């Protein structure tokens, strides 16, 4: 009986803690997030071989770009942005994991590791776009 009481008390504390959190508010549109944050940040990772950082300052910028990719995945999972709790969240989690790994690789200045995670990052983009972006991959109509 004690574990049940403890569990109920813990659930009450957690519910109170989440209700004390200030509400989030989406400021930009999905297009704003993609075009102004995610695309430029992910491009820095996708094109690492042709735009390899040479200085500590450039590596710091790349680490920031990788961090933007990872944290943008968290933004995509917020209420009001997440389209569903299954596929959308799975795609965002792929992006989060690839971005987090890119942050770790950038801290080590490991170009090869960033190149190696490109496929994972691209998979998160393409599967999400196929499912949620109308006409993705289709030729434009004349």
Regions found by a protein language model. Name each.
Residues 1-3:
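Positively charged n-region of N-terminal signal peptides that target proteins for export
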